[in-house]
Amino acid sequence: MLLTVGCSPEPTESENPEATQGQVYTCDLDPDTGKPLPDTCGTRSSDTGSNSISLSELKKLPLPAYFDCVRENKGLLIAAHRGGPAPGYPENTLETLQHAFAEGIRVFEVDIAESRDGVMLLMHDNRLNRTTTGDGYVADTDWADLAGLRMVDDDNQRTDFHPPKLTDVLLWAKQSGAILELDRKPTTSFKNIASAVRAAGAGDNVLLISYSDDEAAEIAAADAGLMMTAGAKGSRDIGRLEARGVDRTRLVAWTGTSSPDYAAWARDIQEGVEPAFGTLGRKGERLDDQYWADGDGSEYQDLVDNGLVLLATDEPYRVAAALKSDDLAREKCGR
């Protein structure tokens, strides 16, 4: 589907009479939202900077095809754990997602909870005291009270940001092309999350995280068209998930956080399924810390060279700066 961005009518590159060899029809992008800016469309040199996008790139692949494209082009998707918190940018806030998107991150793992009165929001902990100015349990608090809280960053600094509704984040993802990995918390259900995704029309911007075959089956039952991550290290695991109703074309194979399993990744790829792995975890123990201990992070390139497609990390900014594979994914496959 071609995105309309303030040029009427909007020609294709081949239809644009002003386009000549070495030129493309482009629009500038808002650095915060990733959306084309109105009244910036025009014919320019094909070496236009990275803050513009051609019409052909505006066509977003359906999410399963997008993952296939990244795998086939040996690209990498970097998933920012809890949305990519940074100084002044707390975890699980829309402003943090926008900040990380402007830094080139395109996949965001975020946590979905539900308030006492049934509003879904981004929040990791059961209690409010660590990441907000509030106290008590999320499940015991109405949305009107949650909405007034301020978010606190990892340095315990209060910000002007508030807990975001899931619906608002879904709409932002749909507009920007971002991909959300939704981690369901016990206060809500896959059924409720899937319903919100459908209502927002954001199915091509969402993966649901499962932690067991039962959860994978529950996701498939809630909406068989949604993509998900589920534990799989080859054909046997994939077949077992298929027997539970999981569509392999909607599957990303999660392979853990303890150590890279190159053989498992090769088996998943042989089945046409993208492997995922995490270097995140407890500070001092996670692979992120081990890989950066010598300052160069070369181990991340080893992951790419062995076929990894989706990397969940607590260091998305450093990894994105060190690798070219995420740039390759955007260049070849869009978003």
Predicted regions and their residues:
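Phosphate-group recognition and catalysis centered on beta-loop-alpha active-site segments
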Residues: C7-R335
